[in-house]
Amino acid sequence: MKRLNSGFTLIELMIVVAIIGILAAVAIPQYQNYVARAQVAEGLTLASGAKTAVVEYYDSKGSFPSGCSIGFDICNTQLGLPEHTSITGKYVKHVTVAGSSGIIGLQFKDAPDAHTLIAKGVVSLTPTVHGGSISWACSNNALATTHFLTPDITKYLPSSCKE
């Protein structure tokens, strides 16, 4: 009597497992990047209120706020914004306006709140005036000082924001 083969052979199962392993090896790092990008997007959304305040201040006064430094609320107060520790998010520690050039800085929380790829990272939004209009460029080095050991999160910024 002839026996019919049913099911998969061992080699076929091993090939399927190998293919799944290769797909997982590619997909997991891409997912990690996606999570980091989404968390950076939250920070940029939180900074949009400060961007509006800086633009309105510049339109009315003809200059950016002065006498500001990192970690103090002098600029936030001049712009009518709440203190920097009040502008927070799930992944963002604070948003502050610093320097006499209208730079907006946002710092991400430490892990596990923020993804380890961006934890404690700093993003700077730098305004540039072009004949009456203001454009914004993002980086993570304009506010980086010796007391910040920040990761390079430039690759997680949206393409519309990069310098």
For each predicted feature, which ranges?
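N-terminal single-pass transmembrane signal-anchor helix
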Residues: M1-K51
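Conserved hydrophobic/amphipathic alpha-helical signal-anchor segments
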Residues: N33-C75, L79
